[in-house]
């Protein structure tokens, strides 16, 4: 069907798991954090500053999946959304209470690391690795 395009995933020869996190997982986490903050009615300008992206990037995150140019390579499973919301809450509080930028950045780093660790433990990052890279065994236990 013309309207139903299946996105072809170009597989690479090999990626280290950290590259998968940088190229695929972090952009998707930024997108989901931005959307959580939008639902909390934070201004786009503030969200962009918090996440270290441009305002047009936030606008892209709001588009439907197939229309996005940013953070569109992978989907974060729905059962992780409560954790995304929790991280967005902590980051928003740290931003508004911010005695210094360092305190906010430490909170953001801690929350993003917590989310990545949870995704890794649940095998989500392994699934993304298999989807985007040749030769990742189904029972790979390297991470």
Go through each PLM region and give its residues.
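Helix-turn-helix DNA-binding helix
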Residues: 58-59
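Short Lys/Arg-enriched helix C-cap and helix-to-coil transition segments
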Residues: 69-86
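Short, amphipathic alpha-helical "recognition" segments used to contact nucleic acids or chromatin
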Residues: 25-41
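Short alpha-helical "recognition helix" segments of helix-turn-helix
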Residues: 43-50
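Short, Lys/Arg-enriched anionic-surface-contact patches
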Residues: 8-29
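Helix-turn-helix/homeodomain-like alpha-helical modules used for DNA recognition
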Residues: 2-7, 83-143
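DNA major-groove recognition helix of helix-turn-helix
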Residues: 62-63
